[in-house]
Amino acid sequence: MEGLCLNLDCSELPNSSWVNSSMENQNHSSNSTRDPLKRNEEVAKVEVTVLALILFLALAGNICVLLGIYINRHKHSRMYFFMKHLSIADLVVAIFQVLPQLIWDITFRFYAPDLVCRLVTYLQVVGMFASTYMLLLMSLDRCLAICQPLRSLHRRSDCVYVLFTWILSFLLSTPQTVIFSLTEVGNGVYDCRADFIQPWGPKAYITWITLAVYIIPVMILSVCYGLISYKIWQNIRLKTVCESNLRLSTSRRATLSRVSSVRLISKAKIRTVKMTFIIVLAYIVCWTPFFFVQMWSVWDPNPPKEASLFIIAMLLGSLNSCCNPWIYMLFTGHLFHDLLQSFLCCSARYLKTQQQGSDLSASRKSNSSTFVLSRKSSSQKSITQPSTA
């Protein structure tokens, strides 16, 4: 996540060189004993291995979810619509954030033109914004579905909201193209690094990214799930009152109908609320260490220099892109089941077609051989038959 380590020289993580290119002069004394052109290869190998595993799980999981939604009969529901776009956002994170970081860790330096450097760091943050805001949109939808169910029954312009989320993600990521560039870090050695003109630049930008991607979304998510929890508590309380009145009511049928309707509202939506809550919890767990370390490194006059701390925080942030699809599978098991059934059905159909093709080919060969033998037999019979003339 070179493009995410805005204040740090992430390409030098393995050898604990954590000073931003714009801050090297004021911190030169603390780095004088380090060689910025070398790294700890053992730590780099571990990081490459973990990133490769995260990339595989993220690609496999999100592709399975998208295929499962495609073949599922409920794919036009609002929840599946948001799940689809959150999976697409996670794929963007995997392809344009985790994969470039993996290649970067393998090569150690950025071996590409300046334009590619700016584009890669830009797309790295696009995926992070899109994934966060798509999760926020999904949670707001669940909040409306629980707190205002009559309003949520009307089909809203979901495509407009999703399109706005993507456009906003692309726009908010544009500063990356200005901040990052191909910079000389040694004698003839170039790397893709951040460069701030003003000394307060890293603090301002890191704080802005943390607010836009983490703090403000988490605050909104907390309000959403606070309202959802309160509404569910009210729902359970009403259900309990109705069930107690059922024993005393003279109009048992009307009360039973009321109890059933309350239970229906709860059962229809509680599962999706649980799923989105677990996704939000995974997001907070994965990204909290990363943003904490980012803010610590720019606001503390004596930031930590331990490479392992920053590497773990970075890898945890990347891990979020492969968590979501497996959470989907856990709460909507029929997605995986439908995908597996479709795969088995297609495989059986393919094998059956192949078998029919081979049987037809064998039948044609058999008929051809029979025809040749009969022709040969008839010709021999005509030769051996005596002439009547």
Curated annotation (Swiss-Prot):
UniProt xrefs under InterPro entries: GPCR_Rhodpsn, GPCR_Rhodpsn_7TM, Oxytocn_rcpt, Vasoprsn_rcpt
Predominant subcellular localization, coarse grouping: membrane
Known tissue expression: Highly expressed in the bladder. Also expressed in kidney, brain and skeletal muscle.
Region forming the signal peptide: none
Chain segments annotated as transmembrane: 51-71, 88-108, 120-140, 160-180, 208-228, 276-296, 309-329
Topology of the protein relative to the lipid bilayer: Multi-pass membrane protein
Glycosylation site residues: 15, 20, 27, 31
CC terms in the record's Gene Ontology section: plasma membrane
Keyword tags: Cell membrane, Disulfide bond, G-protein coupled receptor, Glycoprotein, Membrane, Receptor, Transducer, Transmembrane, Transmembrane helix
Family matches, as SUPFAM superfamilies: Family A G protein-coupled receptor-like
Disulfide bonds, paired cysteine numbers: 117-192
Gene Ontology MF term list: oxytocin receptor activity; peptide binding; vasopressin receptor activity
Stretches of the chain found on the membrane's Cytoplasmic side: 72-87, 141-159, 229-275, 330-389
UniProt-listed Pfam families: 7tm_1 (PF00001)
UniProt keyword Transmembrane helix present: yes
BP GO terms, sorted: cellular response to hormone stimulus; maternal process involved in parturition; positive regulation of vasoconstriction; regulation of systemic arterial blood pressure by vasopressin
Subcellular location field: Cell membrane
Keyword presence, Cell membrane: yes
Alphabetized CDD domains for the sequence: 7tmA_OT_R
Extracellular topological domain residue ranges: 1-50, 109-119, 181-207, 297-308
UniProt-annotated stretches for the region Disordered: 360-389
Family indicated by similarity: Belongs to the G-protein coupled receptor 1 family. Vasopressin/oxytocin receptor subfamily.
Task of the protein: Binds to mesotocin and may play a role in the regulation of water and salt transport.
Name of the protein described by the UniProt record: Mesotocin receptor
Source species: Rhinella marina (Cane toad)
Phylogenetic lineage: Eukaryota, Metazoa, Chordata, Craniata, Vertebrata
